[in-house]
Amino acid sequence: MSVDRPDCRFTVFGPPGAFVHVPNSSYRPIPRTRFFGRHMQWPARIRQMKPDAFFGPAGVLPLGDVGSPSVITVHDLAIYRNPRWFPGRQPLSTRYVVPRSVLRADVVIAVSEHTADDIVEIFGIPRSRIQVVPHGVSPSFSPMSGEDLAAARERLKLPSRFILFVGTVEPRKNLETLLDGWAMMRDRPDLVVVGAWGWLYEPIREKMARLGPGLHHIEGLDPADLPAVYNLARVLAHPAWYEGFGLPPLEAMACGTPVVVSERSSLPEVVDDAGLVVNAASPNDWRDTLERVIGDTDLAADLRHRGILRAAQFSWSRSARLTWRAIDRAVTG
């Protein structure tokens, strides 16, 4: 964002001891005391600075008045849709901080049309106060040459044929349905799961252990290696019950990898006609659709082509421009 507005000065607040490289900016630590410091002391400091606008990219405002027009970005509202997906109900946040932030912000950014609809339904604010700003995709996610891919496959010890899942291992991601569908596939490729253990994952881990050979779990993957993993996959499977946006399908499409997603939340919106959409709750549908993509080279080629074109419509520079539009709107009223 700072690149788009070189005439603007930024004050970035974050954890003590952290360093964020943002041009035209200064860095200041958020007070250490979690509640009183962040919601009372911090707003007082902001008011003293007299900023033209306050931007909360994590979806919340301090409870204290910041003394300027404000914009927040809401990434998803999964905990409101199904609290059982999470280890705790976070009552202070879900009942007070987040609702108050959404109601007070001059402009609320939603990362998808689906998230915008959720904001209206859950909090009752007018749709006119919401601006949709989709996520972007980094240029590093792109088709790679065969030589580079061969080296990456050997270095990362990836199988010759595999279906890919990218995401935290947690209930909301619905990995269990994918595991059931994959286990039923005929002549199935391997399944590579890239992502850390999240929460409430014990039943998922037990199922993964029972499936044995052919299932690979990669934790702590260097982010620089992720484009190569996408490129090497025969297909990305993203069966999530809920996403505010859904970056892995977009990243996979940018790499030219066919994508199969669930029909839930924002995922059909992100892939549009460039991916296949499957019933999130049906292992049989996942099996059948993945077998189609693996076995039909013409279909896979068409999905690769459509995916690259679809992903080209998303960029972080576009996201920055739209975010600035939201901030300008908040400032000018």
Protein language model regions, located:
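Carbohydrate transferase catalytic cores enriched for Leloir-type hexosyltransferases
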Residues: 1-333
